[in-house]
Swiss-Prot record:
InterPro entries: MinE, MinE_sf. This is Cell division topological specificity factor. The keyword Iron-sulfur does not apply. Disulfide bonds: none annotated. Belongs to the MinE family. HAMAP family: MinE. Prevents the cell division inhibition by proteins MinC and MinD at internal division sites while permitting inhibition at polar sites. This ensures cell division at the proper site by restricting the formation of a division septum at the midpoint of the long axis of the cell. Pfam families: MinE. Keywords: Cell cycle, Cell division. It comes from the Bacteria.
Length: 84
């Protein structure tokens, strides 16, 4: 971030904010201190809101799931994007 951006109060892009939130959630999950997948509904709503700014999708067009096997966690996001 440049000094000009800081002084003028330029806002971050919503995609970078969403990316930062995902990184925080994943880092928090790796420490093992959070409840299992309590954040998934909120994450799904936020992702729909961000993606809807660029592509017309509904709540049912995006699915978020978290799978755990041994020491591996997979956060899967499926998005159905209309062809038009």
């Amino acid at each position: 971030m440049s000094i000009l951006s800081f002084l003028l109060g330029e806002k971050k892009k919503s995609a970078s904010v969403a990316k930062e939130r995902l990184q925080i959630i994943l880092a928090h999950e790796r420490t093992g201190h959070s409840a299992p997948a309590d954040y998934l509904p909120a994450l799904q709503r936020e992702l729909v809101a961000v993606i809807s700014k660029y592509v017309k999708i509904g709540d049912q067009d995006l699915r978020v799931s978290l799978e755990r096997q041994d020491n591996l966690e997979v956060l899967e996001v499926k998005i159905e994007i209309p062809q038009n």
